[in-house]
Structure formats: C-alpha cells, structure tokens
UniProtKB/Swiss-Prot annotation:
Family (UniProt): Belongs to the Spartan family.
GO MF annotation terms: metalloendopeptidase activity; polyubiquitin modification-dependent protein binding; single-stranded DNA binding; zinc ion binding
Cited PROSITE patterns: ZF_UBZ4, ZINC_PROTEASE
Role: DNA-dependent metalloendopeptidase that mediates the proteolytic cleavage of covalent DNA-protein cross-links (DPCs) during DNA synthesis, thereby playing a key role in maintaining genomic integrity. DPCs are highly toxic DNA lesions that interfere with essential chromatin transactions, such as replication and transcription, and which are induced by reactive agents, such as UV light or formaldehyde. Associates with the DNA replication machinery and specifically removes DPCs during DNA synthesis.
Compartments where found: Nucleus; Chromosome
Protein name: DNA-dependent metalloprotease dvc-1
Binding positions (Zn(2+) 2): 347, 350, 362, 366
Amino acid sequence: MSRSSLVDPSFELSDPCPDIHALFIQFDARFFGGSLACCEVKWSPRMYACAGICSYEIRGGRGGLCSIRLSKPLLTLRPRSDLVETLLHEMIHAYLFVKERNRDRDGHGPQFQAHMHRINQAGGTNITIYHSFHDEVRLYKQHWWRCSGPCRDRRPFFGYVKRSCNRAPGPNDRWWSQHQQSCGGNFLKVKEPEGYGQGKGSKRTNDKNKSGGPALKKTITPPRVTLDDFFKKDGKNSSDNSTSKSPTKPSTSLFTGSGQKLGGSSSTSSLLNSYPKATQNSGGNRLGGTSGGVSRLLPPVNFTSPSSAPVAEQVIDLGDSDDDDFQDMDDDALEISFVASDNSVICPSCNTEVMENLIHGHLDYCLG
C-alpha cells in the first residue's frame, strides 16, 4: 500500500489519534469540493450501538443542520483506518443530504455506492456499506434481560434482550406489542456489570473511613453574642458605671425673672383689652368679617341669587367635527348637557344665598 493512501499502516504510529475536525476539513476539500462547510462533526460519548450516524434537520423548508456523530466508545478500540473509513462513510451520507436532499440515512443505493467506489479508488480506502464492529458493540452490552414466556426457547435470541444502558424492555420498544401478542411473558434481569448497584455515597464514606479521615461532619455551634458584649469598657459593664454615679442637680436656676400668676383677673383683663373686638353681623359670628358680609382680607365677589323660575336645561353643541377620529360616529351633532339645580341655601357666614352644589367652595372662599 502506497504512502499516499489515507489508511497507510505507518499512520498508526505517526498519528494514531487524529483530530476528526482536521480530517473532516481535509476530506471535504479533496472529495466533496468544500460543499460540506455547513455540516458539523463531533464525538458521541454515549453511542454504543453503531460507529457513526449522520442526521439532517430541516428548518423553514430551506435546508437545515447536518450533523455527523462518531461513537467514541467504539472507535477508540479500533485502528485508525476504521475511524477514517467511518468518517468518510458518514460524509457521503451528508453530501447526499445537502446536495440531493436524500434524507434516507440507511439508503445505500446506486448514488451512495458510486461515491463510495470513487473515494476508495482515489484514497486507497476500503469504505463499506455497513460497519462490522460487532465485538465492540457486544462488549458494551452489559445489561441482560430474559423473557419468562415461550419465546425463551425460540431462535435466534432465545428470549434475551441485551443493552448497554439499564433500560428494561417496555412499551417504548417498537416490538413490545407484537411480543405481548405472541408470547406475553415478563422480562427478568439476569446480568449487569459488577458493582453496578452500589451507590456512590456509600463508596465515598468507605474511602474516608479507610483513609482515617472523619466519616461524619460535626456541627459546631457558634458562641451566642448579646447586646451586653458591645457595652463593656475596661472589663466592666456600663450598667455598673451608671449605678455608681448619682445624678447631679443643676446649681443655678434657668429663669431668674419675677413672673406673673396665671389665671389672675388683672392680667386677663389687660390682655383682652389690648386686642380689638371683632364686629358681628345679624347673621351670626364671623372671624374678621364686617356687617356687610364682605371679608376685609379678600377682594369682594358678587354672588347672584338664582331666580325663582326653574332653570332650563343648558346644552352645549360641539357640532360636527372634521377630525378623522369622528368619521365613524353618527351624523347627529355631538352634545353634552349640563343641568343646573334650583336648590339654594343661606351662607352662615355672610348671609348670602348660594346654590347648594356651590356652598362648600363658597365657604372656603368666604372664610379664607
């Protein structure tokens, strides 16, 4: 085999663990004209049933993401040539997906075989239709179940179900309904990896006990802190210092005048006579008011009393609007009505007749 071959035995020593991304870029430029730049390639650490898989996802009807995944558990046990041929096998599927929209992953028809023979002749490889890693696949299937029904005596499986993960046979399997009709037996687990049922927590505890370390954590209670700890001075509490000293009275008086006796008749009369008396009108007492009922502090305001005749309804006609916001309304004029009340009361301050609905505002204005 020539050195130009992609699977030359010398590469097993010079490059036993190649970078799959570098190989992908090299093979894409050499055999596929760089048309697989939109694809991705990556390792799959939990794929045990097959060596490689190519998936295609359509997004929005304009193409999608093409992904190539290689089984790391299976290919790490195989020679470098198997990795190269498996990668090229999946790249042919990706090329048919991208260029011809052939989404049948298991399709190895004339188109697939044409590209397979072309690459085998150009690169000196031995790409095949199916992978033959049966020994490696069998190695990772450590969880076994066997049926208790009649199918345990039938070829070719004799009732065995072998898997790499701990997932018992059930309704999620495609063949489950057929098995229930033809056999109807129950699956019992007969084999699993050694030490699979042991928990990780007990293992860590045993390791600590063997090494002499503490097996259990001790709870340490922090010391209690009270407010008295923050008021200690020189080893003595502030309460002791405060009790040792007696309170002292002020030596001098704050007020030295003679003062006057509260409630005396002479002082009361003199204080009352020093202020002018407020005038009163016929309508009652009023602070700062005059006999005419007009405040001396505010400008005069005329309040007209309503007539004895009933007040007619006042209508404000806004008319038709030219604005576009009113185009969808009725053709009639938009009207807002205000009805006045004929109830009136007498202001207790200025004896003025004011409408009942305005009395509160009038009192604020009159007494202000």
